[in-house]
């Protein structure tokens, strides 16, 4: 069994208190404790998901349709691209997308004594600073989860229930993360998630673009927010 201490030693890094608490409570484990490979008649959607969907780990539904938390072994054994300048830029990966873009703590930048969160593009030499700490990262992802929700993405995961099914799952995410977020963030998300959906030709939403931008600017802003830098070897 891989301990968080093992990962901290690997990267010479101390995870923030919130990350440690979520880890301890199983809230970062999308595998529900399973480490063994699946049998031929098993897969994650069939075997694991039904066990965790009603009390979901962090961002299970609200992280985005292509978002996935890394397993402990994936964090420990993460293979950095040979083009990444990891001597200059110290990343501690914790999540990824289907396109192999990576979410990571950025050891080079501390804001109010906590490490910033970055989004590293796999097919471009760009890394974006997206949050000043892990709590803000969760809050931002849960805000973005209710803006411009593509109907084609919904069809893929919610064939019969559509947006209504998606909203039920979002509310489950909010319920499970509620004890870990500050009261202000919980209140904001609760109010937005309680809305009726606005529908356009291609998408649904519970929040407008202006509201999303305004909320981010009001609650998440810091000097380096949304700035971009190159991470590859010159």
Descriptions of predicted regions:
Residues 1-102, 109-110, 186-234:
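A surface-exposed partner-binding patch
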Residues 28, 36, 40-43, 115, ...:
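Short, surface-exposed, charged/polar-biased interaction segments
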Residues 102-122:
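Short, well-ordered strand-loop elements centered on a beta-strand within folded domains, enriched
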């Amino acid at each position: 069994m891989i301990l968080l201490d093992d990962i901290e030693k690997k990267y010479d890094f101390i995870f923030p208190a919130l990350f440690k608490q979520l880890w301890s409570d199983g809230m970062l484990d999308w595998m529900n404790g399973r480490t063994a490979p699946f049998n031929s008649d098993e897969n994650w959607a069939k075997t694991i998901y039904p066990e965790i969907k009603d009390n979901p780990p962090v961002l299970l539904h609200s992280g985005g349709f292509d978002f996935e938390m890394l397993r402990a072994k994936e964090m420990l054994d993460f293979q950095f691209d040979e083009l990444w300048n990891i001597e200059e830029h110290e990343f501690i990966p914790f999540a990824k997308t289907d396109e192999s873009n990576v979410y990571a703590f950025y050891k080079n930048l501390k804001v109010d004594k906590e490490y910033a969160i970055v989004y590293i593009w796999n097919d471009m030499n760009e890394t974006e600073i997206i949050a000043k700490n892990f709590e803000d990262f969760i809050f931002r992802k849960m805000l973005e989860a209710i803006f411009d929700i593509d109907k084609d993405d919904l069809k893929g995961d919610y064939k019969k229930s559509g947006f209504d099914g998606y909203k039920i799952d979002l509310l489950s995410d909010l319920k499970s993360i509620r004890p870990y977020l500050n009261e202000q963030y919980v209140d904001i998300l609760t109010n937005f998630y309680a809305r009726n959906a606005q529908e356009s030709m291609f998408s649904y939403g519970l929040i407008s673009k202006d509201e999303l931008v305004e909320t981010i600017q009001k609650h998440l802003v810091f000097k380096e927010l949304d700035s971009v830098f190159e991470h590859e070897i010159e």
